[in-house]
From Swiss-Prot:
Belongs to the RpoE family. The lineage of its organism: Bacteria, Bacillati, Bacillota, Bacilli, Lactobacillales. Gene3D superfamilies: RNA polymerase, subunit delta, N-terminal domain (1.10.10.1250). This is Probable DNA-directed RNA polymerase subunit delta. One of its GO terms (biological process) is regulation of DNA-templated transcription.
Amino acid sequence: MKLDVFAGQEKSELSMIEVARAILEERGRDNEMYFSDLVNEIQNYLGKSDAGIRHALPFFYTDLNTDGSFIPLGENKWGLRSWYAIDEIDEEIITLEEDEDGAQKRKKKRVNAFMDGDEDAIDYRDDDPEDEDFTEESAEVEYDEEDPDDEKSEVESYDSELNEIIPEDDFEEVDINEEDEEDEEDEEPVL
């Protein structure tokens, strides 16, 4: 592979990001590359060993994500941001998401390692059937036939309980003399 951009430069002095940008520019807009293919092309161009690429791979991937000139297109495909207008970037991502919606994915059953073999453990993921019964019954309020106070208002209930303790006939009428209270307030305390 020959990249005209780097003609006359030492390959050992080039960074993987520079080479990745040049490879994608040479391929053109409709030829996005998978990350693994891009890394293989870079390795072939720079002539690096497998161990050297493995060592540089995390740094390259970080640079690829943080460099503003690259854009992830989903499914680990990469392209150059300059290929896409801002509005078109959203459209590309949305069409990729719509394509994925058509394929049904199997749901994985979650396994809790701490619950295995422990019969006394409480599984909080399941709804408690007692809670469901409680909410259904709370909607319908039923009164006890034996206790007529349930149907009365709280004030009536309180009055009837007081009458059981002290019958109404035994209450004494108390006259409140408001003038006396006003006179007491007007007087100043003696020191």
